[in-house]
Regions:
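Non-transmembrane functional regions of envelope-associated proteins
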Residues: 1-149
C-alpha cells in the first residue's frame, strides 16, 4: 500500500477479491513469498450479505443473487491457499478477547529451552488474547506472524 497504489486502485480497504487478484498477479510475476502486515479481522464489507444489509428496497430476486455470489473473504482465502507461500498477520491484545466461532489454530505451543538459557516463560510477556483474521483467510495461510502495533 502506497500513494501510487491508492491512486490507482482507490481508497483502502480494497475488496478482498481485488486483493486476491493482486496477489495472483504478484505470484505470476515471480513473487517467492508474500507476507501481509495487515490483519483482516472483520468480514469484507463488500461481501453479498453486507451489501444486502446496506441497501434499502432491494427485491427478493436481487437479494438472492447478491447472497449467492461467492464471498470476497472466501475468494481471497482460496487464493492464499493456492499460492502456498503467504503469511498473514496477527496481533496480541492486552485484554482477553474470545471469539466464540474461532477455535485456536494450535492447541498448544511446544516449548524448548537450551541448556543454561533462561526459561521462556520468565521473559515472554503474557497476553490476554490475540486478534486474528477471519477464518476463511486465517486457515488458508502457510504461516502466521505476530505484528507489534
Amino acid at each position: 500500500l502506497d500513494e501510487d497504489s491508492l491512486s490507482e486502485v482507490g481508497q483502502w480497504p480494497w475488496p478482498r477479491n481485488q486483493v486476491a487478484q493482486i496477489v495472483s498477479t504478484a505470484f505470476k510475476l515471480g513473487t517467492a513469498v508474500l507476507g501481509f502486515d495487515i490483519i483482516f479481522a472483520e468480514p469484507d464489507r463488500m461481501n453479498g450479505d453486507n451489501v444486502v444489509k446496506s441497501l434499502v428496497g432491494l427485491d427478493t430476486e436481487t437479494i438472492a443473487k447478491l447472497r449467492s455470489i461467492p464471498k470476497n473473504d472466501s475468494i481471497f482465502g482460496k487464493t492464499i491457499k493456492s499460492a502456498k507461500r503467504i503469511v498473514v498477520g496477527q496481533t496480541v491484545l492486552p485484554i482477553e478477547r474470545v471469539y466464540q466461532d474461532r477455535k485456536p489454530l494450535r492447541n498448544r505451543v511446544f516449548e524448548r529451552q537450551a541448556k543454561g538459557a533462561p526459561k521462556p516463560r520468565e521473559w515472554v510477556t503474557e497476553v490476554g488474547g490475540i486478534l486474528r483474521n477471519v477464518p476463511e483467510i486465517e486457515r488458508m495461510a502457510a504461516g502466521h506472524g505476530i505484528l507489534a502495533l
